[in-house]
């Protein structure tokens, strides 16, 4: 077997080759929702924006499923290849693909069956509900395709082809972007047009991803590779649980935030719908930055996983620290944009009255104040997943959302009203950053002693 370049190539080159396509692919998940929101905001108004925000948890749950199986199987593949166990790698990949399909179909059926109940739980108000139901009932059709595409993109990167992974995701986004204005404005389908454009783009990406099954180079499939094995499935899910649990926590905090904003917003001059619409815009804007961080972390995973499996700990340390530097550059640019140009960013998502822009600007500046450090927690969680310490990775992934943000979102508004919801973000970001630095520092010191 040819020696894998992950074990000897310069780390900076590997990170560039793997992370940049991963960033592009990761951005697509955010772009699907943001492009819809921009066109829907222009065509339908802020109630349309609020509707896509209420439906957004469906996308984050979908991504959580894709990460559970995709990251889990890809991490297993990288570790097995690093240990020179090609048959085990093929089994991990094959079982991962089967799980993606099964989970995708189950998710579609559950979502469509309980749609009205779920939308109300997500915070849909009386005025927003009809738009949200129309949008979500259509976009749920594309969720199984999105799960397989996102999951497969991780396996394709583990196979050493990050550029093809990027192409799969980007082409779907291009189709979506082209169809959005046609369906919304030319065909006059409104919010349904944005939903159908999203689904068609997702199906296109799915077809491209599925074609790669016959192109794997480091993985050689046999029929047995696709026979579902319970033990292997458990290993896959255990390795993907940290990334997935973070997304689940994102979904939970979205639901809590939406309900808190409508409750406390009703007690202010902003009302219920303005905070709901503004929150979604701020979150989806921040999702672009988080997608870049996720892309960097996904790009480092094969590098860290392979070299940890090969016991080349100095390369593990180098890859992690370089990824942190990349993250700080991105976060600095984001901080400047969010603090100095918030109204320009918010205006992209459609018009609104003076109160709408007043609250949206306040939300962006306050909630995203600690964007400089909030990516370190994601990188650190991914780091532990890549080296096979999935429990520690899962716990770290949950720190910001579950241990800090959810309690703060529930408690701070009791003292500060609607401002408490906004202040919860930066406090949680800083707390998670400190914990991440401590845990990774201990692990890197341990690896250094084992060299």
PLM feature spans:
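Small-residue-rich hydrophobic transmembrane alpha-helices
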Residues: 49-109, 146-165, 258, 278-342, ...
């Amino acid at each position: 077997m040819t020696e894998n370049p992950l074990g000897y190539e310069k780390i900076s080159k590997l990170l560039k080759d793997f992370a940049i396509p991963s960033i592009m692919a990761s951005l697509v998940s955010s772009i699907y929702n943001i492009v819809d929101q921009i066109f829907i905001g222009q065509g339908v108004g802020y109630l349309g924006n609020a509707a896509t925000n209420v439906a957004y948890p469906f996308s984050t749950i979908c991504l959580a499923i894709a990460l559970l199986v995709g990251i889990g199987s890809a991490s297993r593949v990288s570790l097995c290849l690093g240990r020179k166990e090609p048959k085990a790698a093929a089994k991990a990949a094959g079982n991962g693909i089967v799980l993606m399909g099964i989970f995708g179909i189950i998710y579609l059926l559950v979502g469509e069956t309980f749609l009205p109940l779920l939308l109300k739980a997500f915070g849909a108000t009386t005025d927003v509900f009809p738009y949200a139901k129309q949008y979500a009932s259509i976009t749920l059709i594309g969720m199984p395709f999105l799960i397989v595409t996102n999951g497969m993109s991780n396996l394709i990167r583990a196979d050493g082809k990050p550029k093809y992974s990027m192409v799969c995701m980007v082409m779907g986004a291009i189709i979506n972007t082209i169809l959005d204005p046609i369906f919304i404005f030319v065909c006059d389908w409104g919010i349904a047009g944005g939903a159908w454009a999203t689904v068609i783009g997702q199906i296109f990406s799915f077809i491209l991803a599925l074609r790669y099954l016959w192109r794997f180079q480091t993985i050689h499939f046999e029929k047995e590779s696709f026979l579902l094995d319970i033990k292997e499935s458990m290993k896959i899910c255990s390795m993907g649980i940290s990334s997935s649990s973070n997304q689940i926590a994102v979904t939970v905090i979205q639901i809590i935030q939406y309900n808190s904003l409508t409750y406390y917003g009703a007690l202010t001059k902003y009302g219920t719908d303005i905070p709901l619409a503004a929150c979604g815009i701020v979150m989806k804007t921040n999702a672009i930055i988080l997608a870049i961080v996720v892309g960097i972390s996904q790009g480092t995973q094969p590098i860290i996983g392979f070299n940890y499996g090969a016991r080349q700990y100095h390369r593990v340390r180098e890859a992690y620290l370089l990824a942190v530097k990349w993250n700080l550059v991105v976060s600095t640019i984001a901080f400047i944009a969010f603090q100095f140009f918030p109204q320009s960013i918010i205006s992209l998502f459609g018009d609104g009255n003076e109160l709408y822009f007043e609250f949206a600007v306040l939300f962006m500046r306050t909630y995203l104040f600690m964007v400089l450090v909030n990516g370190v927690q994601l990188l650190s969680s991914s780091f532990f997943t890549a080296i096979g310490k999935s429990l520690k990775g899962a716990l770290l992934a949950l720190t910001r959302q579950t241990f800090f943000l959810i309690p703060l979102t529930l408690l701070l508004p009791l003292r500060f009203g609607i401002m408490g919801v906004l202040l919860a973000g930066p406090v949680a970001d800083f707390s998670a950053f400190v914990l991440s630095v401590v845990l990774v520092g201990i692990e890197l010191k341990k690896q250094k002693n084992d060299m």
